[in-house]
């Protein structure tokens, strides 16, 4: 009886190495398939990135931005092994409601350069006050480098009298009537920066009245308008 008990007790001990081998094989299989630990983490990582992209897409779709490709050129970088060629893109982005920005991006491929420039433009958007939502409040000048631009307010029906990079800015900004003039260099980068310098100086009667602590009608009345006309114009100003 004692021998039989020893034999039965030894049987599970002999089966233990096989069980350990199966456990090791299962462990290797889990790592190989990537289904238990690290594979699950990778899956969650992909899903997480996908959800973040979807959120960004929904925000961009709700904003409905206007994107204009202004200029693209080929660039090169000299390194130890020779030259690396790529592309540089200049993009203007706006919402058509008084906000616009520009961005510059470089990459080895054209689509990637445009994508980088668009992302930079969205981060650099500025608000420009518009009169009646169609034109500027007053004339302005801007310069950058050798480029100098002049922007003027215009009556209804004038349209956008601008060319090249400046037209892209006003179309994305939502301006319907404006007269512009560019003097000096025709470099699109300088023209874009000079135009934004002129737009940053734009002020509205509402902001001036808040800064000076006066009524909008009082400011408009100083231009020679009668009190009723000044009050009507002040009531029509939204920004």
Curated annotation (Swiss-Prot):
SUPFAM superfamilies: dsRNA-binding domain-like, Ribosomal protein S5 domain 2-like. It comes from Rhizorhabdus wittichii (strain DSM 6014 / CCUG 31198 / JCM 15750 / NBRC 105917 / EY 4224 / RW1). Belongs to the universal ribosomal protein uS5 family. The N-terminal domain interacts with the head of the 30S subunit; the C-terminal domain interacts with the body and contacts protein S4. The interaction surface between S4 and S5 is involved in control of translational fidelity. GO terms for cellular component: small ribosomal subunit. Residues 9-19 have a biased composition (Low complexity). Part of the 30S ribosomal subunit. Contacts proteins S4 and S8. It comes from the Bacteria. This is Small ribosomal subunit protein uS5. Residues 34-62 have a biased composition (Basic and acidic residues). Coiled coil: none annotated.
């Amino acid at each position: 009886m004692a021998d039989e008990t020893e034999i039965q007790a030894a049987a599970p001990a002999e089966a233990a190495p096989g069980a350990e081998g199966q456990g090791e094989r299962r462990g290797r299989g889990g790592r190989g398939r990537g289904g238990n630990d690290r594979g699950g983490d990778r899956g969650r990582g992909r899903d997480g990135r996908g959800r973040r992209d979807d959120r960004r897409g929904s925000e961009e779709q709700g904003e409905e931005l206007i994107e204009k490709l202004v200029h693209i050129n080929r660039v090169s970088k000299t390194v130890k092994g020779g030259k690396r060629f790529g592309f540089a893109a200049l993009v203007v982005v706006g919402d058509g409601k008084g906000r616009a920005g520009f961005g510059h991006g470089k990459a080895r491929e054209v689509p990637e350069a445009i994508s980088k420039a668009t992302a930079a433009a969205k981060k650099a958007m500025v608000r420009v006050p518009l009169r009646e939502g169609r034109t500027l409040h007053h004339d302005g000048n801007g310069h950058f480098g050798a480029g100098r631009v002049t922007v003027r307010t215009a009556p209804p029906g004038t349209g956008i009298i601008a060319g090249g990079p400046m037209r892209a800015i006003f179309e994305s900004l939502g301006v319907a009537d404006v007269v512009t003039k560019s003097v000096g260099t025709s470099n699109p980068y300088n023209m874009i920066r000079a135009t934004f310098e002129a737009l940053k100086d734009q002020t509205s009667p509402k902001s001036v009245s808040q800064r000076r602590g006066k009524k909008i009608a009082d400011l408009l009345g100083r231009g020679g308008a009668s009190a009723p006309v000044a009050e009507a114009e002040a009531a029509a100003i939204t920004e």
